[in-house]
From Swiss-Prot:
Role, per record: Binds mRNA; thus facilitating recognition of the initiation point. It is needed to translate mRNA with a short Shine-Dalgarno (SD) purine-rich sequence.
GO CC terms in record: cytosolic small ribosomal subunit
UniProt domain S1 motif: residue ranges: 1-66, 87-155, 172-242, 259-329, 346-378
Record-linked Pfam families: S1 (PF00575)
CDD domains hit by this protein: S1_RPS1_repeat_ec2_hs2 (cd04465), S1_RPS1_repeat_ec3 (cd05688), S1_RPS1_repeat_ec4 (cd05689), S1_RPS1_repeat_ec5 (cd05690)
Annotated SMART domains: S1
Gene3D superfamilies, sorted: Nucleic acid-binding proteins (2.40.50.140)
Keywords annotated in UniProt: Repeat, Ribonucleoprotein, Ribosomal protein, RNA-binding
The name this protein goes by in its record: Small ribosomal subunit protein bS1
Organism of origin: Providencia sp
Amino acid sequence: ETVTGVINGKVKGGFTVELNGIRAFLPGSLVDVRPVRDTTHLEGKELEFKVIKLDQKRNNVVVSRRAVIESESSAERDQLLENLQEGMEVKGIVKNLTDYGAFVDLGGVDGLLHITDMAWKRVKHPSEIVNVGDEITVKVLKFDRERTRVSLGLKQLGEDPWVAIAKRYPEGTKLTGRVTNLTDYGCFVEIEEGVEGLVHVSEMDWTNKNIHPSKVVNVGDVVEVMVLDIDEERRRISLGLKQCKSNPWQQFAETHNKGDRVEGKIKSITDFGIFIGLEGGIDGLVHLSDISWNVAGEEAVREYKKGDEIAAVVLQVDAERERISLGVKQLAEDPFNNYLAATKKGAIVTGKVTAVDAKGATVELTLGVEGYLRASEA
């Protein structure tokens, strides 16, 4: 039987309830469907109770508010299950938070609001979006009537920011965004609510390809980036940071011509040549074959060491491939060309035999100039 009463006191194990002049006992476990420590908000109000025990001889009455709530919830639950449809919007109370989402009480039925369906932007923890006790409106994404499982969405209440994003941000567009996350391979930049793009580490700096993102930007920084590529289907945007800065390779190409003299310090020496540091933080390569006219590259390179100041001539600039070819020997005249200019065809010359093979002999005519004497001509 359901009766109306008022909670008017606290006793061991529960509370006292006045039922039209009759004193009843309300066990603490039967106040609500969930444990209630503080009943201040309930005291003094007329509430519905169900009599679960009545002993007239001992004048002992035990009531339950929980039974009334469960009965009402059951009716509400049945009605909700009957009317619930995928795609509809419903209101609910956030009941519990987990690392993967939030459980929402829709009225006798709990639905899961997964963390990936809370917002279009990256969410690290559900508490960033909702809190226990919040009343929220959600959309029913999936409803398994047999298993009574409901999947809910919050972000689906708004428009998907990825729709037609390529039209809003064509390749080459420059825009500002906020750095939201750093990884070893780059940084993520939010260019609008719910849309993040990746700036790969190779697109951060023109001259340092292996720099760690933390050396360039910090989380929270507002930066200018360029849209390099958009894959709407996979929801991926490639962004560039360095493209919003002047390209030192292009600048060098615009200010230097083939044959120009440049100077710099040796940054490194490898098996194939010498790298020279140039203005703008870029490097140029002197190949072994371009070190000396007279000495083999492997021997000539031994005359140099890292840190040496060195001059060279610009041989070729490929700004697109970020390559600059330099030459040291080109600072001096080519002895071969000089020899040809001074020696006419048919002239008799002298030389020193430096090598002999089955087909003939190699003859040094002058420093840096060799000729080959075939055996048939000897």
